[in-house]
From Swiss-Prot:
The modification N-acetylproline is found at residue 3. The active site is at 175 (proton acceptor), 294 (proton acceptor). The basic functional RuBisCO is composed of a large chain homodimer in a 'head-to-tail' conformation. In form I RuBisCO this homodimer is arranged in a barrel-like tetramer with the small subunits forming a tetrameric 'cap' on each end of the 'barrel'. The lineage of its organism: Eukaryota, Viridiplantae, Streptophyta, Embryophyta, Tracheophyta. HAMAP family: RuBisCO_L_type1. This is Ribulose bisphosphate carboxylase large chain.
Length: 479
């Protein structure tokens, strides 16, 4: 060994492997206002103490690796390392802990959800010392959130663009989602919009397939929008899905939508990717387009309770990346969603300031400062009998989207849309008169049926349809 090598090895460096907790578990640490805070649900392998597991998560998602490296001496680990600063057992579970990790802000590129997730949930989820790992929540400090544009427009600007106030907006996903020609697709859009809906929607997997190329669909849907607007005197829209195989193609589709003069486009933000989504959100703000976001693929990531990432984290990431609407579950429909948990992340989407509330799954107080809000979209297995509950649960700043609940009407698409509009107007009027929608909902709908044969027919068709399954992902409750 040369003298040079001996000198390098002998100055403040000891090779080998040491426990993560010696460096990355710091229960005495006081978090800073500028730290990004994360709450992980950690399930260690047998024999791995929670302190070591939490420290491993902090290390592997920040500056650490499996062994000591001499280049640690070339930087300040105390400045850049993640720190596991608190651990608590999960109620009702023998071998799960919530580990809280603080990350210094300098670890992350400004305005990049992609970089934030690459660090926090990149490698660590495959770590062998853990049986399972789930990111439950993030606290995004204003010093970081202000580096993002956020939603292209936000709730109030959208209401002003549409000139629609004091009620939820109504939408419909065109079905069958695949197989229609562009002209028949546009016809279905027109009938739904003419019948009383505010929006119609491309399904998430409608892009540019052989049976219906995107440009043809855009043209026929624009025709449906203009014709229905002329006949109803209301502003209408169709979520034109601009998701594509490349960012360049996606922007080309958004440009064509703008040239047609339509008000809104759509993106599948998880399958399309956060870089593409942020790019499209910036284009939409610069060019006056609203942006509807579909969360296709989310359940692959968020549905299992002990591994993956909770949707509240994906919702926060979307608000930062940019979107004016996002699907959020229904509570009452066919898709997963516990009520209190759903309302928790709905508030995280819409409100400026959200207090910590573990009863709703919110681990940290979140201050969005002036970032615009996102409208939650309730969609999936809902029909007219659900209208009172949806109006009561989601309030005015929401989109209630009935696909089969519009197009499945026995008299056709326009009567299906009319039935939904009548049901909504009846519920909003009853609420404004002080009636209890949760208790009197069925009575309100039955009364409205007397002066709407379309609603009466819809109520008869779906009177026995229910989706009564226990949710998989639930709030932890003390036993």
């Amino acid at each position: 060994m040369s003298p040079q090598t001996e000198t390098k090895a002998g100055v403040g460096f000891q090779a080998g492997v040491k426990d993560y907790k010696l460096t990355y578990y710091t229960p005495e640490y006081e978090t800073k206002d500028t730290d990004i805070l994360a709450a992980f649900r950690v399930s260690p392998q047998p024999g791995v103490p929670p302190e070591e597991a939490g420290a491993a998560v902090a290390a592997e998602s920040s500056t650490g690796t499996w062994t000591t490296v001499w280049t640690d001496g070339l930087t300040s680990l105390d400045r850049y390392k993640g720190r596991c600063y608190h651990i608590e057992p999960v109620a009702g579970e023998d071998s799960q802990w919530i580990c809280y990790v603080a990350y210094p802000l300098d670890l992350f590129e400004e305005g990049s959800v992609t970089n934030m997730f690459t660090s926090i949930v990149g490698n660590v989820f495959g770590f062998k010392a853990l049986r399972a790992l789930r990111l439950e929540d993030l606290r995004i400090p204003p010093t970081y959130s202000k580096t993002f544009q956020g939603p292209p427009h936000g709730i109030q600007v959208e209401r002003d663009k549409l000139n629609k106030y004091g009620r939820p907006l109504l939408g419909c996903t065109i079905k069958p989602k695949l197989g229609l020609s562009a002209k028949n697709y546009g016809r279905a859009c027109y009938e739904c919009l003419r019948g009383g809906l505010d929006f119609t929607k491309d399904d998430e997997n409608v892009n540019s397939q052989p049976f219906m190329r995107w440009r043809d669909r855009f043209v026929f849907c624009a025709e449906a929008i203009y014709k229905s607007q002329a006949e109803t005197g209301e502003i209408k829209g169709h979520y034109l899905n601009a998701t594509a195989g490349t960012c360049e193609e996606m922007i080309k589709r958004a440009v064509f939508a703008r040239e047609l003069g339509v008000p809104i486009v759509m993106h599948d933000y998880l399958t399309g990717g956060f870089t593409a989504n942020t790019t499209l959100a910036h284009y939409c703000r610069d060019n006056g387009l609203l942006l509807h976001i579909h969360r296709a693929m989310h359940a692959v990531i968020d549905r299992q309770k002990n591994h993956g990432m909770h949707f509240r984290v994906l919702a926060k990431a979307l608000r930062m990346s940019g979107g004016d609407h996002i699907h959020s579950g229904t509570v009452v429909g066919k898709l997963e969603g516990e009520r209190e948990m759903t309302l928790g992340f709905v508030d995280l989407l819409r409100d400026d300031f959200i207090e910590k509330d573990r009863a709703r799954g919110i681990f940290f107080t979140q201050d969005w400062v002036s970032m615009p809000g996102v409208i939650p979209v309730a969609s999936g297995g809902i029909h007219v009998w659900h209208m009172p509950a949806l109006t009561e649960i989601f309030g005015d700043d929401s989109v209630l989207q009935f696909g089969g609940g519009t197009l499945g009407h026995p008299w056709g698409n326009a009567p299906g849309a009319a039935a939904n509009r009548v049901a909504l107007e009846a519920c909003v009027q009853a609420r404004n008169e002080g009636r209890d929608l949760a208790r009197e909902g069925n009575e309100i709908i039955r009364a409205a049926c007397k002066w709407s044969p379309e609603l009466a027919a819809a109520c008869e068709v779906w009177k026995a349809i229910k989706f009564e399954f226990e949710p998989v992902d639930t709030i932890d409750k003390k036993v």
